[in-house]
Regions:
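Proteins enriched for Cys/Gly/acidic motifs involved in redox and nucleic-acid/cofactor modification
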Residues: 1-195
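Alpha-helix-loop-beta-strand connector modules within alpha/beta enzyme cores
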Residues: 202-220
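Conserved small/polar residues in nucleotide/adenosyl-binding loops
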Residues: 228-230
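S-adenosylmethionine
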Residues: 199
Length: 230
């Protein structure tokens, strides 16, 4: 068990991965050494970022939580925290059924983990991430949530209404990532084509793509679309 080390385990989609990368940067800025997706606990603390979208994903998340609970009971881990979509949707039930977990967080309040560790969220690193992808590419999350009401999909229940990120903030992040060697951007959201409708009252994905493409150093852009709606 390594002191001052935190293990981050990410389950689910690339949007979850971006959240983990942001948390990792905040933890590192507060002096922690962070490992990602380790098979076994290495540090004193573990944070599991869960998925709660479909049955298989829920099962995988529960099994991972129980595996780390066992490690905690065996003295291989001091603290265990859980965040992400599963705990956003079932926080009360999980806290009741798995009391070995020190605290459950939702998908959007993971910054409270820093306070519970006696640390502070550093706003100057708000758009910074510790990349876990190969150095030449990164995921770029441009919005959260979804306004569609598809009967088969739980995403709106978990993540809420569609919320676009400000375009200037996204471009600043692209420039920062390019300065770190990123050449390819994989643009992600639950519904890419809704980008801008809430902030700018019209669909702004084409304009956003053009602005990203015009940033010096950007060589490739990929769109991860859930639905075509332009």
């Amino acid at each position: 068990m390594k002191r001052n080390t935190i293990d981050i385990i990410t389950l689910g989609c690339s949007k979850n991965l971006v959240d983990s990368e942001k948390l990792m940067r905040q933890l590192e800025a507060n002096g922690y050494k962070v490992t990602h997706d380790s098979d076994k606990p290495q540090g004193e603390i573990a944070v599991i970022n869960t998925c709660g979208f479909i049955g298989d994903a829920k099962e995988e998340s529960i099994n991972m939580i129980l595996e780390f609970c066992q490690a905690k009971e065996e003295g291989k881990l001091k603290k265990l925290y859980v965040m992400g979509c599963l705990s956003e949707r079932y926080l009360k039930e999980l806290a009741l059924e798995i009391p070995q977990v020190d605290k459950f967080y939702g998908k959007f309040n993971w910054n409270e983990l820093l306070a519970d560790l006696g640390k502070a969220y550093k706003s100057e690193f708000a758009i910074e991430r510790t990349l876990t992808t190969p150095h030449h590419y990164a995921y770029l999350k441009i919005s959260e949530g979804c306004d569609r009401k598809c009967s088969y999909c739980a995403i709106p229940i978990i993540t809420g209404r569609h919320i676009s990120r400000p375009m200037e903030e996204i471009i600043d992040e692209v420039k920062l990532l390019v300065s770190e060697g990123v050449k390819e951007f994989q643009i992600i959201a639950q519904e890419l084509t809704y980008y801008g409708v809430d902030l700018y009252k019209s669909q702004k994905l084409p304009e956003l793509i053009e602005r990203i493409a015009n940033v010096p150093g950007v060589e490739w852009i990929r769109l991860h679309l859930s639905l075509i709606h332009i």
